[in-house]
UniProtKB/Swiss-Prot annotation:
Family: Belongs to the GcvH family.
UniProt-recorded name of the protein: Glycine cleavage system H protein
Cofactor detail note: Binds 1 lipoyl cofactor covalently.
Keywords recorded for this protein, A-Z: Lipoyl
Gene name of the encoded protein: gcvH
Gene Ontology CC annotation, any one: glycine cleavage complex
The keyword Aminoacyl-tRNA synthetase is assigned to this record: no
HAMAP family per UniProt: GcvH
Domain Lipoyl-binding, residue spans: 24-106
Pfam families: GCV_H
Sites bearing N6-lipoyllysine, chain numbering: K65
Function: The glycine cleavage system catalyzes the degradation of glycine. The H protein shuttles the methylamine group of glycine from the P protein to the T protein.
Species this chain originates from: Coxiella burnetii (strain RSA 493 / Nine Mile phase I)
Subunit-structure text: The glycine cleavage system is composed of four proteins: P, T, L and H.
């Protein structure tokens, strides 16, 4: 059964965000998303020091059965990527909310957080999709 930590924000596209400081957030794909994809074999990450808008395609995750785009849930500047995933993409499967994070972003406007879901809202979304 997929887990949805209460301290995270979630998008309808199955990304999660963890607040690291006032403007910095870590982004990854949810436990539900990695379960649906299956064993990941490749992760294409965004470039650093680029600006992205909420909803922009920023990464691609590929499994043995499919590929999926990852969309930025927030607007801002990509400041760091998880280079370890280049050699170990399956880390996302093993630890989606920890070592399997994808990138870090400095956000433009904290008001965009109002468009995201809490853990209960995300759980409801998953149940509605099933």
């Amino acid at each position: 059964m997929a887990e949805f930590p209460a301290e995270l924000y979630y998008s309808k596209n199955h990304e999660w965000m963890r607040k690291e400081s006032d403007e910095t957030f870590t982004v990854g794909i949810t436990d539900h998303a990695q379960e649906q994809l299956g064993d990941l074999v490749f992760v294409e990450l965004p470039e650093t020091n680029i600006h992205v808008d909420a909803g922009d395609e920023v990464a691609v995750v590929e499994s043995v059965k499919t590929a999926a785009d990852v969309y930025s849930p927030l607007s801002g500047k990509v400041i760091e990527i998880n280079n370890a995933l280049e050699n170990e993409p399956a880390t996302v499967n093993r630890d989606p909310y920890g070592d399997g994070w994808l990138y870090r972003i400095t956000i433009d406007d904290e008001k965009e957080l109002n468009d995201l879901l809490d853990a209960d809202g995300y759980q409801t979304l998953i149940e509605a999709e099933s």
